[in-house]
């Protein structure tokens, strides 16, 4: 019911109203495009990155991650793919999970969306999460408990990426993340119809009013959001970001992908 009452409100207004859930999600339409949005208070909730299991095998599916968390008495309140990867699902850029680095920071321009600089890093630290432009991240020496690099940046210090064209006909399903200046407010978005980079970035800057935002990926993008009765199936993913909460032993079966 809350979703109907909040329909059409900026998520920053709608979801900072004392809701008990670890993550709040809603579907909305902005400037003619449809999106699913999930917002997290990083100062209160547990965000994690997932790539490999204890044997070093890529997990790659929401259901596989759920199986791992079940042993901890935890479950996914939300999850989505989080950064670009090679065909073997290894990260293209910086990847750190719980203090262990698998891949170094990549600072040079290159091919594809990842190399469309400026790109950036999604950095998880105690009580906060930040999107930081790659060269600024390198210069700052920021130590992240977990981090994933992707690109391009969507919003840099309140400005759209300089290469984005308003009338571009390059339209795909896209997902990404934006963060507030204090690192508390984190909003994940996935489009429900194909959008160009300009439209997607404008969602974060103009509607969500977030000063930093980072693109995660395109047509492979998937979302696990029990709030929306949604858990997308598909090919194996690389890095995944999720919000973790205690498993309720009285609840029904978890959505499977």
Residue ranges and their predicted role:
Residues 76-78, 120-121, 129-130, 152-153, ...:
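Structural motif
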Residues 19-113:
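Zymogen propeptides
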Residues 90-164:
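Active-site-adjacent helix-turn-beta-strand microarchitecture at beta-sheet edges
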Residues 1-4:
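Positively charged n-region of N-terminal signal peptides that target proteins for export
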Residues 92-108, 163-174, 179-212, 221-256:
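Conserved, well-ordered active-site substructure
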Residues 7-15:
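Bacterial N-terminal signal peptides
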Residues 52-56, 136-140, 190-194:
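Short, solvent-exposed aromatic-acidic interface loops
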């Amino acid at each position: 019911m809350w979703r109907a009452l909040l329909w059409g409100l900026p998520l920053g207004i709608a979801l900072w109203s004392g809701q008990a859930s670890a993550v709040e999600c809603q579907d909305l339409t902005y400037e003619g495009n449809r999106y699913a949005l999930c917002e997290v208070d990083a100062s209160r909730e547990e965000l994690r990155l997932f790539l490999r299991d204890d044997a070093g095998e890529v997990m790659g599916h929401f259901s596989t991650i759920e199986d791992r968390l079940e042993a901890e008495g935890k479950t996914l309140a939300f999850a989505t793919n989080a950064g670009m990867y090679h065909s073997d699902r290894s990260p293209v850029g910086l990847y750190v999970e719980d203090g262990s680095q698998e891949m170094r920071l990549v600072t040079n321009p290159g091919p594809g969306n990842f190399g469309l600089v400026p790109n950036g890093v999604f950095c998880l630290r105690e009580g906060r999460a930040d999107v930081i432009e790659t060269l600024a991240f390198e210069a700052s020496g920021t130590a992240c408990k977990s981090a994933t690099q992707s690109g391009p940046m969507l919003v840099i210090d309140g400005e759209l990426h300089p290469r984005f064209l308003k009338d571009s006909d390059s339209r795909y399903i896209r997902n990404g993340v934006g963060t507030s200046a204090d690192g508390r407010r984190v909003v994940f978005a996935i489009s429900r119809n194909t959008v160009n980079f300009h439209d997607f970035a404008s969602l974060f800057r103009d509607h969500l009013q977030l000063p930093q935002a980072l693109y995660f990926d395109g047509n492979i993008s998937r979302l696990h959001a029990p709030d929306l009765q949604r858990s997308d199936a598909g090919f194996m993913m690389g890095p995944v970001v999720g919000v973790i909460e205690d498993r309720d032993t009285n609840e029904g079966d978890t959505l499977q992908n």
